[in-house]
Amino acid sequence: MQMKSIFFSPLLILIYFAISSCSAPRSILTSGKVLPKGQVRFGINNTINVSSASIEQSIKGSRNLAESVLKNDTIIYSQQLAKLNSVFMAYCLDPISYNTEFYFRYGLGHRFDIGYRNTGGANAFDVMYQFMGSNKNSNESDQDGFYGSIGVQYSWQNYRFVNFSKFDIVQKLFGWDMNRKDITIPLVFSKSFGPEERYGGVSFGVVYSHSFINYKISPKNIYAEKIMDQVPAELLLPVSGKSGFDAYGAFINVKVGKKYVFFNFSLAAYYQNYGKYKMLGGSEVLLKGISIVPSYGMQFNIFSKTKKKPVDGK
């Protein structure tokens, strides 16, 4: 059996994607204190997503490829395609990635704020509600203390391999198409540094998310036309499916600065059982693992025009 002239090591793909891919927004940058009415916050963040599932499938695929080279005069391409298929699926569900993220938040009042963020090719909107602590800014109050909030984020992305040389050809050969939507619910607590987070604060909490996955694989372009009649029928059948999975996580973040400008550092960890997915040739792959998401960046505040209220009528 022949393939079109293209060859990829799963581990090589993993290394390249580590510096060129995008993933759903998973870093937690908010504190337990939502923005007071009229306040604006925006910033830039650098996020790394390290997935054990992508690493595991890439190592397995590369090891099996090496064993085929050592034990056989020729490589059984149908087996290698199945392994490569598993690597792509693991990568799409939870990629190894480094991304620059831009975000914007606005205080609505009544202890609510809203936000938008863009992480590579993924977009997200969220709303947060503060249920504990003061909701004034440092221009209005000298109060210190603990804060608590809960929110919901909706994100979406259409998956596409990077448009780079032969790596872009992979998607065309496999006829790969995937889109993903996520609903994330963070519960956040924080302790202020100074009154009303004037100098920053430390935040921590837990996260739950549910992902909705749609995917399709149309493999006919993988094989040369002259040998199509030699390819087992099951390897030519298109594969499609819908799935969903839950993720459970915890996080901590710290921001330090003064009033208008802050540096922030965050670390989140997630566990997820992605479930089973149909692969080429009728096989299935079961994926699960953990993800570590460190991030760092800067944020800027613009306060509404308010004055600190006088104390005791003075």
Language model: regions and residue ranges:
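Solvent-exposed loop/turn segments connecting transmembrane beta-strands
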Residues: C92-S97, D113-D126, N179, E196, ...
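Bacterial Sec-type N-terminal signal peptides, specifically the leucine/valine-rich hydrophobic h-region
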Residues: Y16-I19
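Transmembrane beta-strand segments of Gram-negative outer membrane beta-barrel proteins
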Residues: V34-S52, G148-Y154
